[in-house]
Amino acid sequence: VEYRPSEKYTIENTTMNPFETKSVTFAEPIEMLYACHGKVRRFCGQVAMLSDYIAENGCNQIVLQTIRQIAQYFNVAAPLHHEDEEENFFPLLLQYAPQAQESVNELLRQHVSLHGNWDAVAAEFAKLEADNAYVPDAEAFKRFVAGYDVHLAIEEPLFDMGKTFIPKEKLTEIGEIMAARRRR
């Protein structure tokens, strides 16, 4: 996610349903992982805009609604997504494409730092909710977005590798596991 101030994005136009999947189902688990990344990009775009928006408009209802949606995604869906990768996709990928081991190891390390970056952003969100005059730490927001920029650039080529090397029936199996994870 690269935030370009010249683009005409506004926080008002980017609120979204965090569970929208554009007709992708767990029958296509790699497409579902990509769909999650689409949400991550959109939410990171919102996080990237927050500091400037708040400086210009204050912490209004739009900001509060936006941070609640972002928090819902990163508190609920993102940990499930990481679990899908760590417990299902990465191990299966390594069975069929062991050359991905170095990238998988790096991504697993990054999952830890991404969670830490989220904790810092969530703390800023909590302060904003408690005190609408609070000025959030823009650096925490930048670290969060930058962490995902790097992460997605390494991870998505592995999704393509999975499409190439993992048999369809194995993908179907992990898709069922991923769907069941969300029903528990």
Kindly give the residue locations of the regions a language model identified.
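Small-residue-biased structural context
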Residues: 3-184
